[in-house]
Amino acid sequence: MSVFTEHRAAPFRRAAGGVLLLGLLLARSVAGQSAEELQLLAWVDDHRGEAVDLLEQITNINSYTLNPDGVREVARVLAPHFDALGFETRWIDGSAFERSGHLFAERRGTGPRMLLIGHLDTVFPEDDPFDTFRLVDDTTVAGPGVGDMKGGLVIILQALQALHAQQLLDDANITVALIGDEERSGSPRELARRDLVEAARWADVALGFEGLETATSAAIARRGATGWTLTTRGIRGHSSRIFDDEIGYGAIFEAARILNSFREEFAAEAFLTFSPGLLLGGSEISRDEISSSGTASGLSNVVAESVVATGDLRTISREQGQRVIARMTEIAEDHLPGTSATLEFRGIPEGMPPKPGSERLFELYDETSQDLGFGPVDLIDPMRLGGADISTAAPYVDGALAAIGGMGAGWHSPDETADLKKITIRTKLAATFILRLMRTQWSQGSD
């Protein structure tokens, strides 16, 4: 049994062979459910109360991304549960990228190498009045992060517990990566996601347990996201002289030109969105990056000297992100007279475009859902999804399947809820899907 102590991660084993190809499924019951699978379903039903208790416990821990003690406390609650299943847990310190850190749990065997991805943090600050788990009705619970994604954490853990209870983890080859800064990535991002990338290089497939606010569905493509900051400068002067050769156009017109040019250039491009979320402009401005707030002052008869705008950029692939960032930078550098501008990005968005291995994972997941009587699984349009850490892992694995966590409504708001019935269904589906995936033949490259 491992101890939850803080240390740096040892390097993951990296496959030296080529792309791993999903092979034919081993023979199983034509009836749809094997005796082992029926035992998994019964175990999940018998332990629904424990699932709700754990969900309440971790929801009542404030794990806002910038609350390192809270993020770490959620990890401390979860780690012993993984230890009890024969996983080796380790805490990866995040001080180098200005965040709390990540919890990884690993169990090595001979089966396909699976990477299960979730996150520990939420968007709700410590002083947010929405701070307590509560029952809304027999099937609905509310609380900060109950849907995104503490319900998903319970699904991951209980699916593995169900498999362990039937002694079905003996050949498991699984890494669970629970990220501590998914909602607001640390910097530099390359360091913040280094261990996840190394885990993805080791893995054959990646499964993302963030959920959705919709019916039973999953995704084989989702967009990556990054943040940007636009800063413009102008020459302060009396407004009667705006546009002349000495004063020029001012910082606000320069910012407006750039943002509107972005809209004109990119609004119609497939799988691409960019959104300014904060804009401050005037004679003097002050911005607090931690609270995402600021102040601005100016007079109607004075040409604005300063503007800062922040927002996000979402693309379906790294290649699309690189191209768009290059063009946005060109636009920002084509200044109006008397102005200057800088445009900074937090990194290149790591999108998750569809690939054949992901399509095969979806087919197996959909087949499993129908075999269990849960009906077909909808394939989600990536435009309906935000960024997630599985997009960082996806380029390195043969197949990736996302959005297989819990369901609810009002996520990232004081109305956030989770559907307990859907958590049970998704747990049964996850446990059975992982079992079937463990028994899938793979064409392995040499290590």
Residue map of PLM features:
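Bacterial N-terminal signal peptides that target proteins for export
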Residues: 2-19
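Sec/Tat signal peptide C-region and signal peptidase I cleavage site
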Residues: 28-32
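Acidic/His- and Gly-rich active-site-bordering loop/insert found
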Residues: 33-144, 164-170
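Bacterial N-terminal signal peptides
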Residues: 17-27
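Alpha-helical metal-binding/catalytic segments enriched in His/Glu/Asp
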Residues: 116, 137-187, 228-232, 243-266, ...
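Metal-dependent amide/peptide-bond hydrolase catalytic core
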Residues: 33-37, 53, 88, 212, ...
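Acidic/histidine-rich catalytic neighborhood of metal-dependent amide-processing enzymes
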Residues: 149-225, 281-291, 442-445
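Short, flexible, mixed-charge acidic loops at enzyme active sites
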Residues: 125-135, 221-225, 289-294
